[in-house]
């Protein structure tokens, strides 16, 4: 076995006591050679446990030097000390210190996780060690299913997992019956014969008598040392595995597994912790989905009224009393606008209310004179029949296109296309019916459309129009087109007697306002998510307190501060992710119920919203889990192991 001698030179260990300090170890100088079997004996409070803690790199001297295989432990930081524990030491405790929620196999394999051993290798080695100690077939038993002697043998196997060049046994037989105690001592002697250095801390002279060397300590000082260091034993001990530190994948897998076990062990508490996250995520997702759905509903309605369109009205602005006196909107303007390169299509519009009759049905409807491109400009589709042709406009044909309301009122379920109705005093043939729009825009009023030439000459008795609607070609900026239209009409009319209404600008304004409102609502909902995150932090702080001994055990077998931090951070993130997933599922449930009561529009649960929920869950887990995880990582292993 390669040398791993232990040397203490003038070691003092002091602890604060009020305003003073108490010396527990006083000027201890000691050497233990590789391969020795040593007993450290003393009464309770003599300092023997403190000495063992320093020997095992769980604690450091206040004064003096401690070397392990020539390496000064006082010059090492926490992670380097953890590596030293992993590579050289194996601990056997009086109360076994096995993790109750892990199987015997997993308890034994735990040190190898932090040493970076691959999963299959550490499982094979753990099985071999358990079989070597007479525990074959007990691999999947938990500590509560094993006797005291069996638990101590599991503890011994764990001490050997990374090689265990130096075995530190603290009262290894103290909690066992005589038979089990004898069995444990037999195993320790065999390990010493195989080349392991075995150091036993005990108050029992009968146990001490079975070792090669006895060191008696009283009031922090070495009272008696039975002999000089023994010669180094033959090299038969299993060497520790090369320690490159735990692989990230192995560390994450172990952290995930332990997080699942911790959640399973406290199901009610985990469920209550998740509840805050579930409500928070469901609130945020639902509010955003409602906001997005309502925005889409409004914007779709606006688009159905015509996109890429600019409407030119008579007068200076809305409410202009002189608007009705403007007579400059003429067919020549339509021709001039159609000649512009940025214009896709143009339609004039003139509207009047007229009585409509068909057989015994007599209703009042809005009759609108339009151009042949009206339905294209407005983005309207025909459910039946056809639209107006160029000849319909040119020859002032008496034809009409109905909306769905007019069709239903006049014809019910009967045929509409081809029927002749009376518009005012003018007979007109129905050539088409406009499809019902999904939105509620337009209400329940009755509308129908005629060629503007027919309406002007046969119904309205006027040649001027009320307005123009211009559809701008795709890719052309509507803002620039609006300016060009204004300049053209100002020149033709000899002045500006009109104003324009840019539908795309309105669309952008509505979209911006909707997003701002959605963001405001989401920020309100985020408050519940923050409250849930605080709940996670509180529960994780409680969990750290409850699992302090587990943290100490993990540190004793070689876990670094980063490993402990990652362990508890993973648990917090996992709780939040599971809560987030349930929250998203709940949002889908809310969306389904919402659709039962609101049929006009739907909540918009888009992939970005779901991704946002997952990101929020992870972020909450990291932010609110970091403080408890950091507290766990900063625990002193001695204090942690001593916690009941």
Curated annotation (Swiss-Prot):
Homodimer. It is found in: Cell inner membrane. The chain crosses the membrane at residues 271-291, 415-435, 517-537, 574-594, 609-629. It is an enzyme of class 7 (translocase). It holds the Pfam family FtsX. It comes from Chromobacterium violaceum (strain ATCC 12472 / DSM 30191 / JCM 1249 / CCUG 213 / NBRC 12614 / NCIMB 9131 / NCTC 9757 / MK). GO terms for cellular component: plasma membrane. The gene is macB. The keyword Cell cycle does not apply. PANTHER family: MACROLIDE EXPORT ATP-BINDING_PERMEASE PROTEIN MACB, MEMBRANE COMPONENT OF TRANSPORTER-RELATED. It is a multi-pass membrane protein. The keyword Nucleotide-binding applies. The lineage of its organism: Bacteria, Pseudomonadati, Pseudomonadota, Betaproteobacteria, Neisseriales. This is Macrolide export ATP-binding/permease protein MacB.
């Amino acid at each position: 076995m390669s040398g791993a001698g232990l040397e203490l030179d003038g070691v003092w260990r002091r602890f604060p006591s009020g305003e003073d300090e108490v010396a527990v170890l006083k000027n201890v100088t000691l050497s233990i050679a590789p391969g020795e079997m040593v007993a450290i004996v003393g009464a309770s409070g003599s300092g023997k446990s403190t000495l063992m803690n320093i020997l095992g790199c769980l604690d450091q001297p206040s004064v003096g030097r401690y070397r392990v295989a020539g390496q000064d432990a006082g010059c090492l930081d926490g992670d380097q000390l953890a590596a030293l524990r992993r590579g050289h030491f194996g601990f056997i405790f009086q109360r076994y210190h096995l993790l109750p929620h892990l199987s015997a196999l997993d308890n034994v394999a735990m040190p190898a996780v932090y040493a970076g051993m691959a999963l299959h290798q550490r499982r094979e080695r753990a099985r071999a060690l358990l079989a070597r100690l007479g525990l074959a077939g007990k691999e999947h038993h938990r500590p509560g299913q094993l006797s005291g002697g069996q638990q101590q043998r599991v503890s011994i196997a764990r001490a050997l997992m990374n090689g265990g060049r130096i075995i530190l046994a603290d009262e290894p037989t103290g909690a066992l019956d005589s038979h089990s105690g004898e069995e444990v001592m037999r195993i320790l002697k065999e390990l010493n014969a195989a080349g392991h250095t075995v150091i036993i801390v005990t108050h029992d002279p009968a146990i001490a008598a079975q070792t090669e060397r006895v060191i008696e300590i009283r009031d922090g000082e070495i009272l008696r040392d039975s002999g000089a260091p023994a010669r180094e034993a033959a090299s038969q001990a299993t060497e520790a595995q090369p320690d490159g530190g735990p692989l990230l994948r192995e560390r994450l897998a172990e952290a995930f597994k332990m997080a699942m076990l911790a959640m399973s062990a406290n199901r009610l508490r985990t469920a209550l912790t998740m509840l805050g996250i579930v409500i928070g995520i469901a609130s945020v997702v639902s509010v955003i989905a409602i906001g997005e759905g309502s925005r889409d509903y409004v914007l779709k309605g606006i688009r159905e009224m015509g996109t890429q369109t600019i409407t030119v009205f008579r007068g200076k602005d809305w409410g202009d009393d002189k608007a009705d006196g403007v007579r400059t909107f003429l067919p020549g303007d339509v021709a001039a606008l159609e000649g512009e390169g940025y214009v896709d299509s143009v339609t004039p519009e003139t509207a009047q209310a007229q009585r409509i009759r068909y057989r015994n049905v007599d209703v009042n409807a809005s009759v609108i004179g339009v151009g042949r491109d009206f339905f294209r400009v407005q983005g309207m589709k025909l459910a039946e029949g056809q639209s107006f042709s160029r000849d319909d406009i040119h020859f002032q044909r008496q034809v009409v296109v109905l909306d769905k309301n007019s069709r239903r009122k006049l014809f019910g379920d009967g045929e509409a296309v081809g029927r002749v109705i009376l518009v005012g005093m003018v007979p007109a043939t129905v050539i088409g019916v406009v499809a019902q729009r999904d939105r509620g825009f337009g209400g329940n009023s009755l509308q129908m459309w005629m060629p503007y030439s027919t309406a002007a000459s046969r119904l309205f008795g006027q040649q001027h129009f009320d307005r123009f609607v211009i559809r701008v070609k795709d890719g052309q900026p509507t803002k620039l087109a609006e300016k060009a239209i204004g300049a053209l009409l100002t020149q033709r009319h000899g002045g500006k007697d009109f104003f324009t209404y840019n539908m795309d600008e309105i669309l952008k304004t509505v979209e911006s306002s909707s997003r701002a409102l959605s963001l405001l609502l989401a920020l309100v909902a985020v408050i519940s998510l923050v409250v849930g995150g605080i709940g996670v932090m509180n529960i994780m702080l409680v969990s750290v307190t409850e699992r302090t001994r587990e943290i100490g055990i993990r540190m004793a077998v070689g876990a670094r501060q980063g490993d402990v931090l990652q362990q508890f951070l993973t648990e917090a993130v996992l709780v939040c992710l599971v809560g987030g997933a349930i929250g998203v599922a709940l949002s889908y449930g809310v969306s389904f119920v919402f659709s039962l009561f609101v049929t006009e529009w739907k909540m918009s649960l888009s992939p970005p919203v779901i991704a946002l929920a997952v990101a929020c869950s992870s972020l909450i887990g990291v932010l609110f889990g970091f403080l408890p995880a950091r507290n766990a990582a900063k625990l002193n292993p001695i204090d942690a192991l001593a916690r009941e």
